[in-house]
């Protein structure tokens, strides 16, 4: 006889109903498996409680400062990256940088001045550092803040 899907049954004893405690003397009533007296019988002890020892969250130092919720994060592209990705020069837009895999789409882009630039490029980005501005204009290129 071949075994089919509708012949399968769970192993005997593997599917038992949850025991409801504290529902009568005959079925785990009264103390309901908690033993007699003491804190654990009367109420729950917090998971973080370490038995009176100074807890870990109080032993560790506090972190200084805060995280500014309104900070604008920029993806960084260096002048050296533009030189490497666009060796023939031309228009460098955010869409072109996304297509080349230099930045992720739908995020702000800032051009920084690390490296050298020898080709003439027209760069469009959200922000530029002062050194990047100098290097792009020195190479004969132009800057467009979007």
From Swiss-Prot:
Q: What is this protein called?
A: Large ribosomal subunit protein uL15
Q: Does the keyword rRNA-binding apply?
A: yes
Q: Which organism is it from?
A: Mycobacteroides abscessus (strain ATCC 19977 / DSM 44196 / CCUG 20993 / CIP 104536 / JCM 13569 / NCTC 13031 / TMC 1543 / L948)
Which top-rank group of organisms is this from? Bacteria
TM region positions? none
Basic and acidic residues bias spans:
15-28
Q: Which Pfam families match?
A: Ribosomal_L27A
Gene name in the database record: rplO
Q: Does the keyword Ribosomal protein apply?
A: yes
**Family according to the record:** Belongs to the universal ribosomal protein uL15 family.
Which key words are in the record?
Answer: Ribonucleoprotein, Ribosomal protein, RNA-binding, rRNA-binding
GO terms classed as biological process: translation
A Gene Ontology cellular component where this protein is annotated is: cytosolic large ribosomal subunit
Job of this protein? Binds to the 23S rRNA.
Region of interest (Disordered), residue spans: 1-45
**Coiled coil ranges:** none
Oligomer status and interactors: Part of the 50S ribosomal subunit.
The record's section on PANTHER family has: 50S RIBOSOMAL PROTEIN L15 (PTHR12934), LARGE RIBOSOMAL SUBUNIT PROTEIN UL15M (PTHR12934:SF11)
> Could you tell me which InterPro entries the record lists for this protein?
Ribosomal_uL15, Ribosomal_uL15/eL18, Ribosomal_uL15/eL18_sf, Ribosomal_uL15_bac-type, Ribosomal_uL15_CS
Q: Which Gene3D superfamilies match?
A: 3.100.10.10
| GO MF, any single term | structural constituent of ribosome
């Amino acid at each position: 006889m071949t075994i089919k899907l509708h012949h399968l049954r769970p192993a005997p004893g593997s599917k038992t109903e949850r025991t409801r405690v504290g529902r009568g003397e005959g079925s785990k009533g009264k103390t309901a498996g908690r033993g007699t007296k003491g804190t654990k019988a009367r109420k729950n002890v917090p998971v973080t409680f370490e038995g009176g020892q100074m807890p870990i969250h109080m032993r560790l130092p506090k972190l200084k400062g805060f995280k500014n919720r309104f900070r604008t994060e920029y993806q960084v592209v260096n002048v050296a990256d533009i030189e490497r990705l666009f060796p023939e020069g031309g228009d460098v837009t955010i869409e072109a940088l996304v297509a080349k895999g230099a930045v992720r789409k739908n995020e702000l882009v800032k051009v920084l001045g690390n490296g050298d630039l020898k080709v003439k490029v027209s760069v469009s980005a959200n922000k530029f550092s002062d050194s990047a501005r100098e290097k792009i204009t020195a190479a004969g290129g132009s800057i467009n803040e979007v």
